[in-house]
């Protein structure tokens, strides 16, 4: 099920977020955790890609466990700051093969002491969103920042980048954490 179908209802949705284990870990315990969490009947479960891509190898495998074993809509995170375009294309192909249609496309944290972007990397999440959209019928989400992205000089600049994400194919947005509801309400009225 596409997340936009869930999010376009008046119902309150509760979701769970999974952090895959580090590379080389055994997945049996994590698959049991997925089953235990699925028994709670969340509207969907998201699976992170890992800070700087460190746990990215298991994202698709756990999202597959969520969707195809436990029959809960899965939202696979995909970050591009620490991945080449070839790696991203490979992940997108895996998602298609496993019929995981919901993707949260993020730039992610830039690895420390790294030249970024390299010629074979995406600079912005909007570029990643465009490529995901061009490679399949995915339901793509993106991040938004009610208090402004730390790298944006102004909130207006941040809203320009937000529009670029939507224009590239982003269908829903999720906020970073905020502590003042008025800031979020003002942000959504400006957006």
For each of these PLM feature ranges, what is it?
Residues 3-4, 27-35, 52-72:
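Glycine-rich, positively charged N-terminal anion/phosphate-binding segment
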Residues 187-191:
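Conserved small/polar residues in nucleotide/adenosyl-binding loops
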Residues 54-63, 85-87, 112-129, 179-186:
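Active-site-adjacent beta->alpha loops and helix N-cap segments on the catalytic face
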Residues 1-16:
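N-terminal amphipathic alpha-helix/helix-capping segment at the start of soluble metabolic enzymes
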Residues 48, 55, 77-80, 121, ...:
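Glycine- and other small-residue-rich loops at beta-strand/loop junctions that grip anionic moieties
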Residues 14-16, 45-47, 74-78, 105, ...:
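Hydrophobic faces of well-ordered beta-strands that scaffold small-molecule active sites
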Residues 16-28, 75-86, 143-156:
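Active-site mouth loops of central-metabolism enzymes
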Residues 27-44, 92-103, 122-139, 149-168:
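Alpha/beta enzyme core
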């Amino acid at each position: 099920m596409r997340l936009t179908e869930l999010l376009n209802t008046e119902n309150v949705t509760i979701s769970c977020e999974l952090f895959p284990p580090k590379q080389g870990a055994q997945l049996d315990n994590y698959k049991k955790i997925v089953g235990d969490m699925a028994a709670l009947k969340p509207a969907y479960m998201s699976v992170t890609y890992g800070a700087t891509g460190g746990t990215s190898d298991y994202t698709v495998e756990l999202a597959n466990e969520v969707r195809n074993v436990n029959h809960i809509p899965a939202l696979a995170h995909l970050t591009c700051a620490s991945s080449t375009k070839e790696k991203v294309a490979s992940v997108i192909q895996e998602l298609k093969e496993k019929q995981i249609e919901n993707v949260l496309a993020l730039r992610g944290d830039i690895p420390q002491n790294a030249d970024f972007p390299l010629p074979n990397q995406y600079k912005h999440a909007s570029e990643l969103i465009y490529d995901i959209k061009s490679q399949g019928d995915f339901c793509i989400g993106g991040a938004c920042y009610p208090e402004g992205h730390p790298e944006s000089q102004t909130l207006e600049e941040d809203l320009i980048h937000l529009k670029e994400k939507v224009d590239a194919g982003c269908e829903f947005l999720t906020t970073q954490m905020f502590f003042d509801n008025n800031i979020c309400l003002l942000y959504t009225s400006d957006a």
